[in-house]
């Protein structure tokens, strides 16, 4: 619903904006070619694209856009992907008709707490947001158009998982007593 205050006056739905659709398709195209979040962000900036708020692309915003299922077309492949990853699916496979996009809910945890330099007169708050595991998401078919084929979106998720696995390896452990403390001249 839209409107202000407690009484909402009308319902609104996601609508396709041609420039945004082209930008998202370009983002996925560049990532598929480069297989690099940083190179994708740099190329998007080089081509003159900006985020919704007018900022330059960075690795964080690029990763968020690539992981967002709202751009994925809701079809049988998407349904099976979320089923395999224990996503909370609403509706059955017949709802995933290949005509609409996916809507995902309950994707983030948000915490708000008082900052250390907050005062009674001038309160300051810090808000932390972290992404929940896919198994806690609620997945449904939206009324909006999907911008990216489910195959391309799933391939992108697999590439992102490979990148995360590559860079999230535990550091080497050594039993040497002075390892990291003593250096050769």
Predicted features along the sequence, with ranges:
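Conserved catalytic breakage-reunion loop centered on the nucleophilic residue
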Residues: 1-185
């Amino acid at each position: 619903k839209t409107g202000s205050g407690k009484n909402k006056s009308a319902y609104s739905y996601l609508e396709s904006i041609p420039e945004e659709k082209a930008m998202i398709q370009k983002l996925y195209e560049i990532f598929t070619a480069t297989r690099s979040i940083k190179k994708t962000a740099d190329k998007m900036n080089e081509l003159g694209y900006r985020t919704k708020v007018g900022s330059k692309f960075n690795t964080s915003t690029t990763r968020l856009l690539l992981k967002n299922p709202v751009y994925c077309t809701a079809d049988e492949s998407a349904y099976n992907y979320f089923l395999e990853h224990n996503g909370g699916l609403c509706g059955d496979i017949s709802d995933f008709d290949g005509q609409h996009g996916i809507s995902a809910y309950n994707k983030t945890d948000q915490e708000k707490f008082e900052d250390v330099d907050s005062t009674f007169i001038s309160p300051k708050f810090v808000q932390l947001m972290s992404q929940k595991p896919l198994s806690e998401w609620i997945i449904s078919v939206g009324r909006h158009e999907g911008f990216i084929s489910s195959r391309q979106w799933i391939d992108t998720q697999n590439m992102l998982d490979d990148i995360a696995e590559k860079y999230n390896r535990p550091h080497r452990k050594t039993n040497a007593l002075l390892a990291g403390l003593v250096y050769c001249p």
